[in-house]
Structure formats: C-alpha cells, structure tokens
C-alpha cells in the first residue's frame, strides 16, 4: 500500500537510494558512478534538503513493515527563475525505486500514478524526469506510461 513519508522509515529509504545507485553503478559503461562510504548519508541528506526547498513529497510503498518502493516528486520551475520566459508549473520526479526482488508487479506504476496525481492536484501542468541512458528497462517503463524524450545529455569520454 502507498503511504506518506514517515521519518521512522528513513533507514529503509536510505537503503532504497543506495540500491538504486548500486544498480546504476552496475550498468554504467563509463564507470562514473562510484559509491563512497559517505554516499548513503550524504545523498539522503541532500535529497531531503531538495524536497524541503522545492515543496516536494515522498510516497512510500509498504508491504507489512517493509518499504519496498518509493517515489520522490518536486516542484520544478527552474526555467521561470533562470530565463526571461514564463513556463508552466512543472513537477519533477527525481526518484522512482522498487526493490529489485519484486519489480514487474505493478508497484512502480502505482507509485508513478500516485505522484502524477499529487503533482496534478497542486497545479502542475507537466512532469519532468530523468532516466539513465543505460537503464533500458526504466526507459521502456516510462515510455509505456506516456513519457517521451525531450532532451538528451551527451558525453565525450577519455579526453
């Protein structure tokens, strides 16, 4: 079941964030994503700061006493603050994580839909998210749920 963020789940949230980054590290062909000992606490702290700063929200998927998935959404209006044009109010999904041992059971779709509904309810007109290029399953998942590529980051390596 989907529940609102509760501080008592912080350690499980940290575990989920690390699990995602370990997955990214394993599929990163360039080997850029190297997790340090400080990563777990530092990434969680920065994530929580960003949630607070950007009127964000964490939704958790709970089975019994375990958090097996989460989604983080923020208000993303960087363009309004940076450039001389007016952009619609946008949401941004920064994390969508489902524990690897229970993926493909609809939990990711439920979390994504719940965050989309929340962002829509607070006036967001569209939602941005990023997916690591080598995470083909995630990209297919997002496309299946109506997302499309709007911008592509490119890298030149071995300079």
Task: List each language-model region with its residue ranges.
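Conserved acetyl-CoA-binding loop of GNAT-fold acetyltransferases
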Residues: 124, 143-152
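A short helix-loop-beta-strand connector motif used in the catalytic cores of GNAT acetyltransferases and
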Residues: 45-60, 92
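A short beta-loop-alpha structural element at the N-terminal edge
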Residues: 1-28
